[in-house]
UniProtKB/Swiss-Prot annotation:
Coiled coil: none annotated. It comes from Salmonella paratyphi B (strain ATCC BAA-1250 / SPB7). This is Peptide methionine sulfoxide reductase MsrA. GO terms for cellular component: cytoplasm. GO terms for molecular function: L-methionine-(S)-S-oxide reductase activity; peptide-methionine (S)-S-oxide reductase activity. The gene is msrA. Its EC number is 1.8.4.11. Pfam families: PMSR. Has an important function as a repair enzyme for proteins that have been inactivated by oxidation. Catalyzes the reversible oxidation-reduction of methionine sulfoxide in proteins to methionine. Keywords: Oxidoreductase.
Amino acid sequence: MSLFDKKHLVTQADALPGRNTPMPIATLHAVNEHSMTNVPAGMEIAYFAMGCFWGVERLFWQLPGVYSTAAGYAGGYTPNPTYREVCSGQTGHAEAVRIVYDPAVISYEQLLQIFWENHDPTQGMQQGNDHGTQYRSAIYPLTPEQNAAAHASCERFQSAMAAAGDHRPITTEIAHATPFYYAEDEHQQYLHKNPYGYCGIGGIGVCLPPDA
């Protein structure tokens, strides 16, 4: 597909067919050696897309209360896509990170603060120098509570931007979570395995105001 095509989301009818077999990944997280798939009792899951998932995953695995992180694909149509397929723009997915966290230590609201303050949510189908629908900003809530918090935080961040003199509209997609597909193992904890690797994320200098 051309770069122009990759700036527009593919329709479900035109998406690649994919496959039934999940991507094989390591059993344990390369940084903290926690399970890559299990969710311990009392913990919750969050899904965020902020551009290239290498830097995004590192941002979240460093936080106290985060049990595990995983790079993957969300918000699209093609089952079990490959990285190459996602980069073609023909699967509909965003590069996303799955975060398993302990809400007794770090809240979803705190995760949203990290989300908003560490990327540019106004860039549409790109993030920085990374162009394509897979780099879009997105939040994929799993519960009505997460959905309400995501929308409320978006409104607060838009107001904070305006107060700072930035009147660009937020383009972040907020949509109920569809299946999350793990990326290939080489992409998991990529910046731990490749500490001098590419990290293209950065905020716009605006802070998320606290929930009233």
